Amino acid sequence: SHACEGRDLSDEQETIDEVQTLPLDSWHRRKGARMLPFAGYEMPIQYESIVVEHNWTRDQAGLFDVSHMGQLMVTGENAAEELEKLLPGAIASLKPGRTRYSLLMAESGGILDDLMVTNATPWIEGDEEEGTEGYWGDPAYYLVVNGAMKWDDIAHLREHLDDDVTLTHLEDRALLALQGPNAATALNRVMRNVIDDMVFMDSVVYDFGEWPLRITRSGYTGEDGFEISVPAEFAESLADRLCAEIEVRPIGLGARDSLRLEAGLPLYGHDITEEIDPVSADLGFALTKKRREQGGWIGHEAVSTVLANGPAQKRVG
């Protein structure tokens, strides 16, 4: 594939040039979506109009299908240490059920992708009758990477992660983002008491009937919101349940982009590329102080030089 010259992507990457369909493809079409290819998938660009959808999300709650994004799980005793070789953020100190924004770094100090990392280490319940205590299971980290970059990211992770760490691509899961000031109200009505104690960047697993969900309080619109990972086979039913709430309407990729821009959030491939280091991209917050000093991650030397001399240019806005 021209997109990743010289990288062996094994058999995982079927023909990348073929445009794929999302699990919710026919659902979007029934809702009147205008579909266009983006990041290798037919994506809903708009339903009614970008302006109407943008404003609805700012006032109410919008449902976005972001299933094109890559959902990955990294597991193993040394998972945190291994990820810290590739990401400049503090992963080892990330508590179970917490999420952090981070960057996948190139040796040049450029950014291969930006991503969300959640400590997904499971809590194993004890058994009162048997007198056994609950305990934390094997370390696990849930990663959400950009759709356009996911095959490159998977190849990069496979290349650099140690053999005793397992990387699983959760290809059978869809991802829905419910965003807007009334997102919590609507979600609470659908799933009572699940999100009551959740603060920004909290992540929980929850069995909604027979659907095993992962719900993270985050998003990319500048509004309060939740990203819900759901097995693809149940995605349509979940989308219907959410859109049955009066506050919720489906929102296309066009409004997702205008909301992101208005909130000043960077988009990989536009504001962030492999040619731009985190300091110039104004993402210095993703480099924790301790890890800046410690080093030991890909791209550290190049980034240290920029930190010492100041960036040549800086993203603003």
Say what each PLM segment does.
Residues G70, V74, L112, Y141-A148:
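Short coil/turn segments at secondary-structure boundaries
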Residues H2-S102, G110, T121:
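Acidic, proline/glycine-enriched N-terminal capping motif
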